[in-house]
Amino acid sequence: MARERIRSRIDRRNFLTGVAVAGAAGTATTIMPQGAAASATTAPLTDPAARPSALPPTAKMAAAETGTPQEIKRDNGTPGSDFMVDVIKTLDIKYLPCNPASSFRALHESLIDYGGNKSPEFLTCLHEESAVGMAHGYFKAAGKPLLTLCHGTVGLQHAAMGIYNAWCDRVPVLVVGGNDLDAAHRPPGVPTFHSAQDINALVRDFTKWDDTPVSAQHFAQSFVRMYKIATTPPYGPVMMSLDAGLQQEPIRENGEKLYIPRFVPSSPPQGDSGAVKEAARLLANAERPVIVVDRAARTPNGIKLLVELAEALQAPVVDQGGRMNFPKTHYLNRPPNVIGQADVIIGMELSDFWGVVNGFIDNGDHGIGFNESKIKAGTKLISINSVELITKSNYQDFQRFQVVDVSMPADAEATLPALIEAVKAAIPNDRKAAIAQRGEAIRKAYTDGRANVRRNAAIAWDASPVSTARLVMELWAQIKDLDWSLVASEGNVSFWPNRLWPMEQHHHWLGRSGGYGVGYGAPASVGAALANRDLGRFSVSIQSDGDLMYAPGVLWTAARHKIPLLAVMHNNRGYHQEVMHVQRLANFRNRVVNLGNDMSPLGTSIENPDIEYHKLAESMGWWAKGPIKDPADLAPAIRQAVAVVKSGQPALLNVWTQPR
């Protein structure tokens, strides 16, 4: 109602109809609204009431607003952007999170008018990094990629961090960047500032493929190709530069019939049969085999396959959490310290195999610390990792080089069936009793470990600000009977959800950001919640305070598009990772760290003033409550918030927490 009242009072064209325009040869005199001239002759300009509140429009501006648009002779052919929409629709892309811009105005108009704003539906974002982050989170919940559009040089630079996260996290995101390529025809001024000869170069180091189509048919081929490349393991973001002129150019009848290539998915690469057989031999004859996984389970079936392999070997599984790889309730789920006793280690889709088997001790000299091996001499190492197929050189996401004994540049999930069959065939009959006995020992260690985790979680249970373990368990108590999905939670709450919640299904945990870029959590949560809304799941995120402030506008997007999400703030009022870095260096240098007037080293705290995240969320259309500092207030607040989210709205709780 408020919006309607405002529109009845203020209208740009009605406002400008009273503007008096005078001048000759392009020269404009002072322009005032009707009735202002008479008062201006009697009131001195030094009188504040007589001064205009804003600069009046120029004659040119007024004419542009009130005049009749110039008649432009147009070709009656089909707009090229309409055909582009036809291409996009063949791939069943459900949503398009995007910040609007002129370099893809033709495609935008075709999507919402010709395409009916369906498949894809345009989702208004307030920042390009939010748009890419939403697509990132959506894929991990739905298993299907989204398309996003970026505006030239400036929009793509905004999006770059989100694209890098997707690259490191092996997630397909389809990015199309609008660009005014033809210097002879591009508009002068701002559009030229926002153009480049090769905008794809901005992100080429961390995209799987890119192209710049020069015709409508070229677009059709390249768009289907980019979708195919992005969705073939190893997954990754892809990029297309799309000329604004090409979008607006009509399709003329010149005898050449346009066609849309049919999409046929590629099968993922599988491990060589000889390498699979050798890996199975090593595992079947090992005394203490260990399985380490990071992004091995691409789908729910990947979890089942990993359970089958682990049970065949009675081998402990170390899940590094890039995806939900292995049930937390399974007795073979074990912490990383089991690596030290291993004689054979198989790593599947690991981000950092070197870091799995080696330690790095920070001695205060960055990049010089001490290295130490975590494994016994002679331990055999097996790697199945599809990322070897797309390794690049500039960005160092491939980590340190680790020598292994068997290396398969292949998709782990696709290779698992053959590996399981080979392992079962390779286990000698006289080893089966020892393998079963090994499993019983691991089962006891699992039971003891769970009890120890629960004891540790009880420490500072009644503390204020709230302990992160208390926060996590109070949250669990309210969502445990729902079909829940933890859509985002970096390791900043001491991994309590992964340690305490009975995570068993693929959607229970969607992993982390990949590139560890701050600002991922909120957009990815909203994107995943969008997917879960359509799947009937309840979405919850544990939202870091500093992370939210990188892209808070995504809260508005969630409210605007009715995306239900429960965001519980981990509001420790600081960048605690950096708190520890500065404190560590001060300790090394035998100094007392300078806190100023804050609780943390200068430059690391987010306080004085404290950000009222609940009010921020309320201003963007969320139900919100806070600040919550007393743990006794948590349960009723979470109960309220859960009810709000179940009704279809987003809700945020601003909880003051301990640092970790």
Give the location of each predicted region:
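Conformationally flexible catalytic loops at phosphate/diphosphate-handling active centers
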Residues: 69, 197, 225, 229-285, ...
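Phosphate/pyrophosphate-binding active-site segments
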Residues: 51-75, 214-217, 241, 255, ...
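Active-site diphosphate/adenylate-binding microenvironment
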Residues: 81-84, 89, 107-112, 441-531
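Glycine-rich, acidic loop regions that bind phosphate or pyrophosphate groups
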Residues: 178-220, 319-442
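C-terminal segment of N-terminal export signals and the immediately downstream linker at the start
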Residues: 31-81, 85
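N-terminal secretory signal peptides
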Residues: 1-10
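Glycine-rich, anion-gripping cofactor-binding loops and their flanking helix/strand elements
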Residues: 140, 293-390, 503-535, 550-553, ...
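Thiamine diphosphate
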Residues: 185-194, 339-341, 416, 496-659
